[in-house]
């Protein structure tokens, strides 16, 4: 197996360790009935100020508050940034920690490479971001790890030289093309293929049809088919109907004990009840690339959602590489560093590619 070139940072004197943790396909868009709704306004509602009774809220209701965090006080934000400093501000020390090691890049899609938008079908990445990812992939093995269907995220990214892990890592495929001589040979890369939940396809399809019918009565709700999992989006649902979405989904899942319900940013996720997540996908890809159990590897995982926390935790447990959370506001995370938005992600990727490119003969 042909290796990627390891990253070297001779101009950086000292390595700085990552800081310790803080402790801690779509249905058609439903036209809104009655008065028009400003999705952005409703997406930003702070549930803690609602005062509305939420039947059966509990942990789910609390998670929705977490997905619409209040604006943090300056002091709180400053404390959080001390524990999760900007990966741009700490760029040189970060590279020093990777000195002599093989960088492997893992990237979430929504909220990381593209902005979060009301219509998930319109979550396109910019040409500038695509170029930044392409340049990074010239130098380092690069994977997109997304909750989206693998084919859909490939259609968004449009870079065939990457590894893609869709459906929260349950559907993994190696590159269709390897353009650089230092990449894993094409035959070996194409052999990287894994589907963790094929036996669940019929039941996922059945639940998709049922939920699609159920959500027709809730304006703004959408069901996305991600092959091995389903996403019920409620970003454009009125706040007073959020619990109705939750109850409808739970009522369907009572008939399917082999499926589990998780949540992200204004989305409910339905997945097979198997021990597989984005962290497992990261481990699988490192092993497939021949990097498992090696000390000369430096994985970097960048993501914005709670589903990315599984990957951040894997890196912490490995004691190798770093996790970078994309967030403007403080939130509990196992990531070591932070970036505020996709624009900063793009700048980070550009700097990484430029540093590596400057060292080429």
UniProtKB/Swiss-Prot annotation:
EC number(s) stated in the UniProt entry for this protein: 3.1.3.12
Claim: Transport is one of the keywords in the record: no
Cofactor: a divalent metal cation
Disruption of the gene: reported phenotype: Additional long branches in tassels and abnormal long branches at their bases in ears. Abnormal identity of axillary meristems.
Keyword Hydrolase attached: yes
One GO term of the biological process aspect: regulation of secondary shoot formation
Tissue: Expressed in axillary inflorescence meristems.
Protein role: Removes the phosphate from trehalose 6-phosphate to produce free trehalose. Is specific for trehalose 6-phosphate. Does not possess activity toward glucose, sucrose or fructose 6-phosphates. Regulates inflorescence branching. Required to establish the correct identity and determinacy of axillary meristems in both male and female inflorescences. May act through a sugar signal that moves into axillary meristems. Acts upstream of RA1. May have a transcriptional regulatory function.
NCBIfam families xref list: HAD-SF-IIB, T6PP
Protein name, UniProt field: Trehalose 6-phosphate phosphatase RA3
Gene that this sequence comes from: RA3
